[in-house]
Amino acid sequence: MRTATITRETKETQIYLTLDLDGSGRSEIDTNIGFLDHMLTLLAFHSDFDIKLTAHGDHENSGMDPHHLIEDVAISLGKCINEALGDKLGIRRYGSFTIPMDEALVTCDLDISGRPYLVFNADLSGNKKLGGYDTEMTEEFFRALAFNAGITLHLNEHYGKNTHHIIEGIFKSMARALKQAISIDETKVGKIPSSKGVL
């Protein structure tokens, strides 16, 4: 069973997350940020991960920006992915997927390499808010996820106008690429997918 559970409590956030990489796309998401809930639900559905997440942050009572919560959710999700993958024996390792989301086109390319890195090319400047979600936090979300999951992650917006569509394309393409990368390669069962013998 490729599963993981994390409880993360700081002075700013309280997070409980369970993850099953070999699920069916079911999710129960509650971050009190509607747009983030929507994106994480899409991530679960398109990756076939089962995700149960409850997250609360200092912004709920203070009126502060939910920056800490968004980043800590990504940290927790990244840690769970890394833990659930375990020794990574037999995984395909690489994933690549392009999503057309109406007028927007977004590609995710990733390598479960153990060498975390993020390349993020999407124009989300302008301090837009979507349901309490600061769109500029999207890059920070994926940086935290990549560095805690041990993933080399490239996210590229080829073009697009609608911010919601661009971000949705990013989450969906990431989900589909992850689904590819964590799947088992029947020709490499029981083997580390690296010529070095370690990831």
Swiss-Prot record:
Q: Which UniProt keywords apply?
A: Amino-acid biosynthesis, Cytoplasm, Histidine biosynthesis, Lyase
Q: Where in the cell is it found?
A: Cytoplasm
Q: Which GO terms describe its cellular component?
A: cytoplasm
What the entry lists under NCBIfam families is as follows: PRK00951.2-1, PRK00951.2-4
Query: Pfam families per the record?
Result: IGPD
- What organism does the UniProt record list as the source? Lactococcus lactis subsp. cremoris (strain MG1363)
Family membership noted in the UniProt record: Belongs to the imidazoleglycerol-phosphate dehydratase family.
Q: Which GO terms describe its biological process?
A: L-histidine biosynthetic process
Q: Pathway listed for it?
A: Amino-acid biosynthesis; L-histidine biosynthesis; L-histidine from 5-phospho-alpha-D-ribose 1-diphosphate: step 6/9
**One term of GO molecular function:** imidazoleglycerol-phosphate dehydratase activity
Q: Which reaction does it catalyse?
A: D-erythro-1-(imidazol-4-yl)glycerol 3-phosphate = 3-(imidazol-4-yl)-2-oxopropyl phosphate + H2O
Q: What is its EC number?
A: 4.2.1.19
Transmembrane ranges?
A: none
InterPro entries named in the record: IGPD_sf, ImidazoleglycerolP_deHydtase, ImidazoleglycerP_deHydtase_CS, Ribosomal_Su5_D2-typ_SF
Q: What is this protein called?
A: Imidazoleglycerol-phosphate dehydratase
Q: Which residues form the signal peptide?
A: none
Question: Which Gene3D superfamilies does the record match to this protein?
Answer: Imidazole glycerol phosphate dehydratase, domain 1 (3.30.230.40)
Under HAMAP family, the record lists: HisB
